[in-house]
Amino acid sequence: MSVQRLGYLGIEVSDVDAWRTYATMRLGAMEAPAPEGTARFRLDSRAWRFMVTPGPADDLSVAGYEVDSEGALMQVKTRLEAYGVKVTSESSELAAERGVLGLISCVDPAGTRLEIYYGGTEMFEVPFASPTGVKEFRTDDQGMGHYVLAVPDVDAALDFYVQGLGFHLSDVIDWQVSPEVSVRLHFLHCNGRHHTLAVVGMPSDKKMHHLMIETTNLDDVGLAYDRCVEDDAVILTLGRHTNDHMVSFYGATPSGFAVEFGWGSRVVEPGWSVVRYDAISIWGHKIMRGE
């Protein structure tokens, strides 16, 4: 049994109010009730999909992965322990704070806290309503989106996520960042989303390279792009990726890493073959400011 989808992300930020404005008025997320001093945001019928908590890191603090049942959660726990990972069965108080029925946690080889849970809270009685008019984000069985981690040991990270958590390799990109620098990105899936996680070995003062949210309407990408252009917050222009075929742009967050806002990613189907690429984009994704 593997994890089945990305359920939520937690980010430690130095300016919660700046994130509140960015998430709602630039990304189009809906603010949700949250513990005092923090902020949470919705993308769909779930109670929340990402949260920001105060602190100096301006970086990823936790990634929450979902499974479908208590039995599935126990199978993942057994798998991780057999792999040699210390797993903590979290308290009912933390589960209630997260809005889930059951919760375990562990730490990946790069030091990222992972929470694995079942029984997330649905809020159909309070329909999702984007403050910027985003029609719909693509979530459901594909989870909330994806994120990319900069890690010190790629082999250790890949082994953990594939052997420990049950991810599968989608493909690899050898990215020539500059004439002097080339990095290899590994893209991993745990459901039909082309990648829920990617890992890259590169010098970085942050774990989080970027996170991605996907809409079901191309116009929502263009409208978000216009909003970010107004703030001079575009890092990479509109473009289309070689591997997942997503049309997207990258914008700067108040914490310094990027958010990819996209549409149109292809789906991993049975019989998927792993391939490699020499470029990250078919067209576009030109640098507008330092990444």
From Swiss-Prot:
Domain VOC: 5-119, 143-264
Record-linked PROSITE patterns: EXTRADIOL_DIOXYGENAS (PS00082), VOC (PS51819)
Gene Ontology molecular function: biphenyl-2,3-diol 1,2-dioxygenase activity; ferrous iron binding
Co-factor(s): Fe(2+)
Keyword Oxidoreductase tagged: yes
UniProt record similarity statement: Belongs to the extradiol ring-cleavage dioxygenase family.
Record-given protein name: Biphenyl-2,3-diol 1,2-dioxygenase 1
Species in which this protein is naturally found: Rhodococcus globerulus
